[in-house]
Amino acid sequence: DLYPYTLGGRVVAVMTMIPGVGVLGTLAATIAAGLIEYRERGQKGLRTYMLKHHLLVLGWNEKSFGAIDDFRHDPRYLEMPICVVADLETTPIAEPVLFVRGRPGSRDSLSRSSAEFAAAAIVFANDPNNPQSDHETALIALALKKLNPKVRLSAELIDPENREHLEAAGCD
């Protein structure tokens, strides 16, 4: 082992060790706090994602979880990242599904989910028991198609009479 022999050397060593331990502890705490904040921002939907060739789930209701589960088990979508955009406080589903908090039709929410680079999207009705939800679904579809005209888009239809409107909005 190497250690200082003289009194002066020992004083310098102690004076160096104490701040060194403090700096190392501060560095570790800063890194840990940053990682925790990063994870919390993801759970609260406050992150911006840089994605390409991903699946967007716009809106959330009780059918959304089943649809995501189906996509997760379909070999065509197995490697494709999934990003949920919904006006909820926290993520409705665990990772590896990504979450963006906000109105599904807003430019900010679509931009933070890299909607312009999405390969496919599905829009869920805000209230599956209210036929008026089709109007909001059509607006979301229009907003997405404006950003990404090539996206393959499906939407939940409540009232069959509104089918033409959703097709006109770009739903496949």
PLM features: residue spans?
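Cytosolic regulatory regions of ion transport systems
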Residues: 3-4, 8-13, 17, 21-172
